[in-house]
Curated annotation (Swiss-Prot):
EC top class named in words: isomerase
Free-text remark on how the cofactor is bound: Binds two Mg(2+) per subunit. The magnesium ions form salt bridges with both the protein and the DNA. Can also accept other divalent metal cations, such as Mn(2+) or Ca(2+).
Cofactor needs: Mg(2+); Mn(2+); Ca(2+)
Protein name in the entry: DNA topoisomerase 4 subunit B
PROSITE patterns: TOPOISOMERASE_II, TOPRIM
Listed Basic and acidic residues bias regions: 387-398
Residues flagged as site, Interaction with DNA: K455, N458, H510, R626
Chain residues that bind ATP: Y7, N47, D74, G114, L115, H116, G117, V118, G119, A120, K341
Name of encoding gene: parE
């Protein structure tokens, strides 16, 4: 990288003030839930990654401290410690003025994940306290802040050093992050591991010093994104070794790695200056366009596609593909769509990636002739399967019209009276008996009931054409009415929420997993929009007394049960619910369907790589990885079933009191 870039006090450029951050934190970090909390860490880590990205330093240490604060330390150049042109110490400017940083000037960084990066100042604004320690020019400097960004000390010189780098320690403000200020090791782990995959020379250490949670992990990958693709494909049957190529065009560096597996869905992970672009963008478009064009040219050259044959569709070519596309774009060309970094808008990136892939991929296909021919045949089979499923797809897309009538006539769906798709809810209910209670107990205005009577197919192992043959899944597709797979359009959904309601036993849990696998693989935008939920019926019913003095209570956990038992004293009757059908309509409404009193679990995808790997482990063909995961993560005891509430990763929402910034 360009080491002549001048990272000095004058390269820090002030764009605007910081006043609104504490008042409207969601505008700056997306939310104040678990995602927003961890986003604070990523902002500081990304500053350290920018140093490595530009050739300065190669180590980042992240430590969750005993008191719940977190430290991020690098061995880069260290923040500038002089006086800024505004008259304040530069460190104070960086931590108290929004959008103040080297990435906004012309000189601090050649490339960065910046532009909309809110950085250190927002982290400071949303912290109870923050401290920064800088090793630079042979000296150690220190400054502290408190109460959401107010300096509690000036920049002071503490001693001498032979090191360089920056260490930032902060404790999130619990008046902002009211749900929790506790950092999740696994959530941080996935993001930090990702950064290490993308920069070959980067070494990252993650420590947890909290009592009872002590843990340490190291991430360093000498083969970079090649190892990243292998990691994503773990547990899958791969068809060849990982292919990699890189190049430069239009001043943009391009790195690509890919590998095909025997499954039917694609997984493309794209990055810009080490920042994940989960909504894709121009670089991803360039990759897909070039790959489609090169594969079609090759298929015709080897005569697998005749003159009269239609070109292969990109979706067919990418069936079973896992790829990582990473680009590094100079600051002056960097452009994202919207206020987040989730979608790249730089037009030059499309032609750059297209150029590199179009230049390198043909040589790879020629060199691996036998493999390439089999990949072309695989794509042709996918095309034939897509054509076979086309009619069913179009039926699913028009689910609101013709097929909706068929579904209603079949007697399966009990629709809501309202046509307001923004408020309507669809309950997917296990079994006819529970479905009957749900129909009688629901609020007819906005709640629709779809009983699931037959076997739900495992969509992890099935092609789309086979999925359409499964009556239960087909009915769900038509009922939701927004299409499926690449045709799915969330804006066409008939329902704002899809709620899975099953018995609290192993069969019910299995149905939940099968349905979640389907939604994750074929209606992913619904999950990403936080619109898929799991209903949580009570496990116990307690009754005491008769007539007017009769008291009925419900418990969702063993802890609640113990509390109620002590509260009620002797003489109560206890019922352990094994199935939804054991509740009458009134009880089902009051405990599980009434928005005022019910408890829902919102299904969220924290990280698609981890989620995809977990689905493959639990629902794929290979038995050994599944056995190992179960032995590691599941505790077997005398109880028949374990409450889903025992899972610390589950986010429980009681009484439908949703944080507006979460929805």
């Amino acid at each position: 990288m360009n080491k002549q870039n001048n990272y000095s006090d004058d390269s820090i450029q002030v764009l605007e003030g910081l006043e609104a951050v504490r008042k409207r934190p969601g505008m700056y970090i997306g939310s104040t839930d678990k995602r927003g909390l961890h986003h604070l860490v990523y902002e500081i880590v990304d500053n350290s990654v920018d140093e490595v990205l530009n050739g300065y330093g190669n180590e980042i240490d992240v430590t969750i401290n005993k008191d719940g604060s977190i430290s991020i330390e690098d061995n880069g150049r260290g923040m500038p410690t002089g006086i800024h042109k505004s008259g304040k110490p530069t460190v104070e400017v960086i931590f108290t003025v929004l959008h103040a940083g080297g990435k906004f000037g012309q000189g601090g960084y050649k490339t960065s994940g910046g532009l909309h990066g809110v950085g250190a100042s927002v982290v400071n604004a949303l912290s109870e306290w923050l401290e920064v320690e800088i090793h630079r020019d042979g000296n150690i400097y220190h400054q502290s802040f408190k109460n959401g960004g107010s300096p509690s000390s000036g920049l002071v010189k503490k001693g001498k050093t032979k090191k360089t780098g920056t260490k930032v320690t902060f404790k999130p403000d619990d008046t902002i992050f009211k749900a929790s200020t506790s950092f999740n090791f696994d959530v941080l782990s996935e993001r930090l591991q990702e950064s290490a995959f993308l920069l070959k020379n980067l070494k990252i250490t993650l420590n947890d010093l909290r009592s009872g949670k002590e843990r340490q992990e190291h991430y360093h990958y000498e083969e970079g994104i090649k190892e990243f693709v292998s990691y994503v494909n773990e547990g899958k049957e791969v068809l060849h070794d990982v292919a990699t190529f890189s190049g430069e065009a239009n001043g943009i560096e391009v790195d690509v790695a890919f590998q095909y597996n025997d499954q039917y869905s694609e997984s493309i992970l794209s990055f810009v200056n080490n920042v994940r672009t989960k909504d894709g963008g121009t670089h991803e478009v360039g990759f897909k366009t070039a790959m489609t064009r090169v594969f079609n040219d090759y298929a015709r050259r080897i005569n697998e596609l005749k003159t009269k044959d239609k070109n292969l569709d990109g979706n067919d070519i990418r069936e079973g593909l896992t790829a990582v596309v990473s680009v590094r774009i100079p600051e002056e060309l960097l452009q994202f769509e919207g206020q987040t970094k989730s979608k790249l808008g730089t037009s030059e990136a499309r032609s750059a990636v297209d150029s590199v892939v179009a230049d390198k991929l043909p040589f790879y296909l020629e060199e691996k002739g036998q493999l390439s021919k089999s990949l072309v045949k695989k794509a042709i089979k996918a095309q034939q399967a897509r054509e076979a499923a086309r009619k069913a797809r179009e039926d699913a897309r028009s689910g609101k019209k013709n097929k909706r009538k068929d579904t209603l006539l079949s007697g399966k769906l009990t629709p809501a009276q309202s046509k307001n798709t923004e408020k309507n809810e669809l309950y997917l209910v296990e079994g006819d008996s529970a479905g009957g209670s749900a129909k009688l107990g629901r609020d007819r205005k906005f709640q629709a009931i779809l009983p699931l009577r037959g076997k739900v197919i495992n969509t992890e192992k099935a092609r789309l054409e086979d999925i359409f043959k499964n009556e239960e899944i087909n009915t769900i597709i038509h009922t939701i009415g927004a299409g499926v797979g690449t045709d799915f359009k969330i804006e066409d959904s008939n329902y704002n929420r899809v709620i899975i309601m099953t018995d609290a036993d192993t069969d019910g849990a299995h149905i939940q997993v099968l349905l979640l696998t389907f939604f994750f693989k074929y209606m992913k935008p619904l999950v990403q929009a936080d619109r898929v939920f799991i209903a949580l019926p009570p496990l116990y019913k307690l009754e005491k007394g008769k007539g007017k003095t009769k008291r009925v209570e419900y418990a969702w956990t063993d802890e609640e049960l113990n509390k109620l038992q002590k509260e009620l004293g002797k003489g109560f009757t206890l019922q352990r619910y094994k199935g939804l059908g054991e509740m009458n309509p009134e009880q089902l409404w009051e405990t599980t369907m009434n928005p005022e009193t019910r408890t829902l679990i919102r299904v969220q995808v924290e990280d698609e790589v981890r989620s995809s790997k977990r689905v493959t482990t639990l629902m794929g063909d290979k038995v050994q990885p599944r056995r190992e995961w179960i032995e590691k993560h599941v505790e077997f005891g005398m109880q028949e079933d374990q409450s889903i509430l025992d899972n610390s990763e589950v986010q429980v929402l009681e009484n439908d009191q949703f944080d507006e910034e979460e929805i």
